[in-house]
Amino acid sequence: MKTRILTMIALTIIALGLLLGLKIGRKNTDVEVVNQAPSDTLQVKRVYNLIILDESGSMSGLEDVSVSGVNETLQTIRDAYKEFPQQEQLVTFATFSGTPSILNGNSYCRVKRHLQEINDVADFTVREYCPTDSTPLWDTMGLLLCELEEHVTVDDIVLVTIITDGLENTSRKYDSEKIRSLVNRLDEKGWTFTYIGANQDAALAAKDMGIRNSYQYSSDEEGTRNMFKKERSSRMRFYRNSRVETQINRLQEGYFDEDDKE
């Protein structure tokens, strides 16, 4: 009799243990489901960074600070990729002057880095930067924008940065109307443009080209250094916001504004 009672007690304990284990398992499963990140947050997005730097004669004397600023910008993109690995960062970097480049098909545009993943992008060097001649900005923009458009898909993010210390004065193929039409068309596709200018009314020059974001800087060593510093902080904020912003037009405006509020 005692043996039967002990057996029943043991079976009861085992049954309770199994039941308790099932409940714990269900709770753990529930917790895992709740904590699991939504699959869409892990989606990889391509970010195309097009950086266009003036290499005309008026940039002479600012070679070191300009090259340093470009490299700091490239490092910002590297840092962004480390922080946001779901953003695949691609870089095209080019300069321009009125002296045709034999290496670039006698074009005014000098492509230094072309559609490279950021971890493959080598730093810019002073030997690659020799300011001379005039400012064919529109032809350079037209060439680079049309070429980049061939690679961009509807889900990609595009950030175009133009840095110049003077106004357009040499282009032959593109005029202001053609450039404005091109920029407006790409703007409608969600591309973000920024125009950084010295020795001019940068806001007016940007507006004439259909560019929403502009920043004015002083074309001396300190002004150039401060300009690159501001651009880098604005760029990092852009990458951060692009991860969560669903309305692309909100990314396209106010690129520099938040810096002013800090």
Task: Mark where each language-model region is.
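Acidic, low-complexity intrinsically disordered regions
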Residues: 7, 11-262
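Positively charged n-region of N-terminal signal peptides that target proteins for export
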Residues: 1-4
